[in-house]
Each structure stands twice: as structure tokens, then as C-alpha cells.
């Protein structure tokens, strides 16, 4: 039996983070968590990290696709927060961000990690951005690093 598993330490990885500006009071914490995980746990060098800000979560997929197509990155991490409000806007933005990023992941040769919070309220978002429920930005960054190594092992 052949079992493929991989570590997250990836010192030579080139990682792009695409982050939504909308709800930046939450997203700043996701970014901090992702950067900490990349540098401290993944041992990724500063010069190998690119951060791209976009207006909102809806713009994450097209930007992730553009980054993936450059060939300059080993993974893309998408970060953002969509909080349910009183209209159907939440369903449209959250759904399109999710399906768009999944499509980019399926059609590119690099991992695209999903670090987009989709919450019912601000409190849930705060909890998932570094307080009671961990930091989903850090988790997405670690997922990207592990997947870089998993795909390398599969293709070896």
C-alpha cells in the first residue's frame, strides 16, 4: 500500500494571499494569522509571499485565477469575510466566492485554499478570526502548504 502524506514546512514555497478589503476589521486578523503560519510554521520567506488586496469576496476568484495563471506561485490562499445581513446578498456573494474559488482550484495546477468566513453575524466572524474558534486564515495557509507538498509527492 502506498500512502501519501505531507508536512507543512515548505521553506521555498511561493504563496500568494488574495484578501478582501470589505470587512477588513476581520480580514486583517485572517491575514495576520495566515502570515504567521506561513512564516513561523511553514518557514516561508518574506520575499516569497505576495499579498493582493481586492474590494470584496466576490472579486477573490478572478484574482486567484489570475495569480494561478502567472506561474509565479505554488499556491493561492483566498481570505475574506461574508456576514449574513437582511437581504439575499449574502447567498450570492458567499456562493459565488465559494464556487468560483473551487473552480479555480479544479482548473489550475496549484492549490487554492479557502479562507473565507461565511457567518451569521459579526460575533461568529470575530471568533473565527483568532479568538475562540482559532484563526481560519492560519488554517487556510497551512492547508495550502500541505497541499503543495501532497501534489509534489503525487507527481514525483
UniProtKB/Swiss-Prot annotation:
Source organism of this protein record: Erwinia tasmaniensis (strain DSM 17950 / CFBP 7177 / CIP 109463 / NCPPB 4357 / Et1/99)
Family in the record: Belongs to the DMRL synthase family.
Protein name according to UniProt: 6,7-dimethyl-8-ribityllumazine synthase
Pathway terms, separated by semicolons: Cofactor biosynthesis; riboflavin biosynthesis; riboflavin from 2-hydroxy-3-oxobutyl phosphate and 5-amino-6-(D-ribitylamino)uracil: step 1/2
Single Gene Ontology MF annotation: 6,7-dimethyl-8-ribityllumazine synthase activity
SUPFAM superfamilies registered for this protein in UniProt: Lumazine synthase (SSF52121)
Protein residues bound to 5-amino-6-(D-ribitylamino)uracil: 22, 57-59, 81-83, 114
Keyword presence, Coiled coil: no
Entry keywords, A to Z: Riboflavin biosynthesis, Transferase
Assembly, per entry: Forms an icosahedral capsid composed of 60 subunits, arranged as a dodecamer of pentamers.
Function: Catalyzes the formation of 6,7-dimethyl-8-ribityllumazine by condensation of 5-amino-6-(D-ribitylamino)uracil with 3,4-dihydroxy-2-butanone 4-phosphate. This is the penultimate step in the biosynthesis of riboflavin.
Coiled coil, from the record: none
Amino acid at each position: 500500500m502506498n500512502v501519501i502524506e505531507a508536512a507543512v514546512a515548505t521553506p521555498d514555497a511561493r504563496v500568494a494571499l488574495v484578501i478582501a478589503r470589505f470587512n477588513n476589521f476581520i480580514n486583517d486578523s485572517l491575514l495576520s494569522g495566515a502570515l504567521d503560519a506561513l512564516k513561523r510554521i511553514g518557514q516561508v520567506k518574506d520575499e516569497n509571499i505576495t499579498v493582493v488586496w481586492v474590494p470584496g469576496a466576490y472579486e477573490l476568484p478572478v484574482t486567484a485565477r489570475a495569480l494561478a495563471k502567472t506561474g509565479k506561485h505554488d499556491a493561492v490562499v483566498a481570505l475574506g469575510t461574508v456576514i449574513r445581513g437582511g437581504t439575499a446578498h449574502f447567498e450570492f456573494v458567499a456562493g459565488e466566492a465559494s464556487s468560483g474559488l473551487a473552480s479555480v482550484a479544479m482548473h489550475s495546477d496549484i492549490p487554492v485554499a479557502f479562507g473565507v468566513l461565511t457567518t451569521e453575524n459579526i460575533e461568529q466572524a470575530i471568533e473565527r478570526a483568532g479568538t475562540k474558534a482559532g484563526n481560519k486564515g492560519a488554517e487556510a495557509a497551512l492547508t495550502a502548504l500541505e497541499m503543495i507538498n501532497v501534489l509534489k509527492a503525487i507527481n514525483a
